From Swiss-Prot:
InterPro entries: CobW/HypB/UreG_nucleotide-bd, Hyd_mat_HypB, P-loop_NTPase. It comes from Methanocaldococcus jannaschii (strain ATCC 43067 / DSM 2661 / JAL-1 / JCM 10045 / NBRC 100440) (Methanococcus jannaschii). Coiled coil: none annotated. GO terms for biological process: protein maturation. This is Uncharacterized protein MJ0120. Disulfide bonds: none annotated. One of its GO terms (molecular function) is zinc ion binding. PANTHER family: COBW_HYPB_UREG NUCLEOTIDE-BINDING DOMAIN-CONTAINING PROTEIN, HYDROGENASE PROTEIN ASSEMBLY PROTEIN, NICKEL CHAPERONE.
Amino acid sequence: MKVAIVAGTPGAGKTSVLIHTIRTLINEGYKPVVVKIDCLYTDDDVRYKKLGIPVLVGLSKDMCPDHFAIYNFEEMVDWAKDKGDILLIETAGLCHRCAPYTKNSLGICVIDATSGPNTPRKVGPFLTSADIVVITKGDIISQAEREVFRERVLEMNPNCRIYEVNGLTGQGCVEIAKEIIESKDIKDLENEELRHNAPLCICTLCVGETRVSKKYHRGILRRIDGFMEYEGE
């Protein structure tokens, strides 16, 4: 089965880009299915269901959505196998440190050109380890700003393929669909691995500690000066 994982910051247009891409995939005779990962709430599944495709929603709630998606990856693929031939996973995009792509999936980063020229330097592995970077909202900034933004993306990920896409009209989504169609299948799910390590977990805050004093905290901790240490038994 082909698996494409779509990551990006909130409001970048991930769902809109995927909807236009799915229409192209359907027109080409494919049977895409979608898993939508979010934190506390989503109604994006309603938009997907209007396309007449199977949709599964996963809410991570108190768990990091990146860890949640990774932990449930095998279950998502198993769910999709008898429903379609392409699995599209839309992640929550909660933090800039997300690293959701696996080695044999197609990693798609959706990033908003209006978020500022330094954003590509801030977002980490979901851009730097992506196969494809989709730049949205480029039509509402100047040509000079678009060129600077594009160069910053290439600075952080020189091997990626960049597409400028309009989430409203769908312009550019045919090319995204073609990339998905031409991507490789995941054949050995048991040995599939992440491209980049996930954000750090577990610390005392992760398991419910609310006191802020440093003396109450255990686990893998990073100090303000950048030093990382382990506190505990």
